[in-house]
């Protein structure tokens, strides 16, 4: 199993690469790519960690050597948020980066499962889909927007509030991956109940958690370490499922039946070829139903922005 990380010299990429080097199954290969000249050195640095995961780093304009034979590609390349920016301010720079990298994937490893981490995910996933479609290699079961950070944040905040162990809380999060499009299904956590005020406050905190980190880092970056952990969790789940493990479920942002929007984050049963089954979002509370209906316009606009970027 070969996993490629594109954008591997950045804050998310380095954290992700470290976690994959220590946690991928023995015999896996890890390839790191970034435009930055330091990238081969990041791979050398990580190669000294004693695990049975082969690692190689590549830099420059051409990602092809890193992509050859890749089964999974995780894209974290792009610029990070600064205070005062929202994820959509990143669009102007990151849209072009994602388009370029996905064009290279379409040529070099069109069969690979692709996880998009680069924000704004609501839009960059639509860009990737259109690029793959133009190249004639699009498989909607193999393209994911990685929303796992919303899930791990939800798990952490709920556990803190309710005095539970964070490892035993699992909150499904649906919708998209920015602001109001992030919808944690707090009504679906077994054995935990909330007041209306707690639900309103928690939902808002989860939606704004990225901004919390950007502000706390005071201009020095955005959520890189927790995002690295979230991306590793998703990537490792995908690898386990592709290697035949049964019952692996993760929420991610994928193209579905279009019932709510063309792309939508929901629980997915993962399998050998990516998405095996798009699972139901279950029964929503009145609050969740209202939040879902209220976000769809925003989500659809985000998606259209990505489609238009490729097709204009």
Swiss-Prot record:
InterPro entries: L-lactate/malate_DH, Lactate/malate_DH_C, Lactate/malate_DH_N, Lactate_DH/Glyco_Ohase_4_C, Malate_DH_AS, Malate_DH_type1, Malate_DH_type1_bac, NAD(P)-bd_dom_sf. One of its GO terms (biological process) is tricarboxylic acid cycle. Keywords: NAD, Oxidoreductase, Tricarboxylic acid cycle. Signal peptide: none annotated. Coiled coil: none annotated. One of its GO terms (cellular component) is cytoplasm. It catalyses: (S)-malate + NAD(+) = oxaloacetate + NADH + H(+). Disulfide bonds: none annotated. Substrate binds at residues 81, 87, 119, 153. It comes from the Bacteria. One of its GO terms (molecular function) is L-malate dehydrogenase (NAD+) activity. NAD(+) binds at residues 7-13, 34, 94, 117-119, 227. The active site is at residue 177. NCBIfam families: MDH_euk_gproteo. Homodimer. Belongs to the LDH/MDH superfamily. MDH type 1 family. Catalyzes the reversible oxidation of malate to oxaloacetate. This is Malate dehydrogenase. It comes from Klebsiella pneumoniae subsp. pneumoniae (strain ATCC 700721 / MGH 78578). The gene is mdh.
């Amino acid at each position: 199993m070969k996993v490629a990380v594109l954008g591997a010299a950045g804050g998310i990429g380095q954290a992700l690469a470290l976690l994959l080097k220590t946690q991928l199954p023995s015999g896996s290969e890890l390839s790191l790519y970034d435009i930055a000249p330091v990238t081969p050195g990041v791979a050398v640095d990580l190669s000294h960690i004693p695990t049975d995961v082969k690692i190689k780093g590549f830099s420059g304009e051409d990602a092809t050597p890193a992509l050859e034979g890749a089964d999974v590609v995780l894209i974290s390349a792009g610029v990070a948020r600064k205070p005062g920016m929202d994820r959509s301010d990143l669009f102007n720079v990151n849209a072009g980066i994602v388009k370029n990298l996905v064009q290279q994937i379409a040529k070099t490893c069109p069969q690979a499962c692709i996880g998009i981490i680069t924000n704004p995910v609501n839009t960059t996933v639509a860009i990737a889909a259109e690029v793959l479609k133009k190249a004639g290699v699009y498989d909607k079961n193999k393209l994911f927007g990685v929303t796992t950070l919303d899930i791990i944040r939800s798990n952490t905040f709920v556990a803190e509030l309710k005095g539970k162990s964070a490892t035993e809380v699992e909150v499904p999060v649906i919708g998209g991956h920015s602001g109001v499009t992030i919808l944690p299904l707090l009504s679906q956590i077994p054995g935990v109940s909330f007041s209306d005020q707690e639900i309103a406050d928690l939902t808002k905190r989860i939606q704004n958690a990225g901004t919390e980190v950007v502000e706390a880092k005071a201009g020095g970056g955005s959520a890189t370490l927790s995002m690295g952990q979230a991306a590793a969790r998703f990537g490792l789940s995908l690898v386990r499922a592709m290697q035949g493990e049964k019952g692996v479920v993760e929420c991610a942002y994928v193209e579905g039946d279009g019932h709510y929007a063309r792309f939508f984050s929901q629980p997915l049963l993962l399998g050998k070829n990516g998405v095996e089954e798009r699972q139901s979002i279950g029964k929503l509370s009145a609050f969740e139903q209202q939040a879902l209906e209220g976000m769809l316009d925003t989500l659809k606009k985000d998606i259209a922005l990505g489609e238009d970027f490729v097709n204009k």
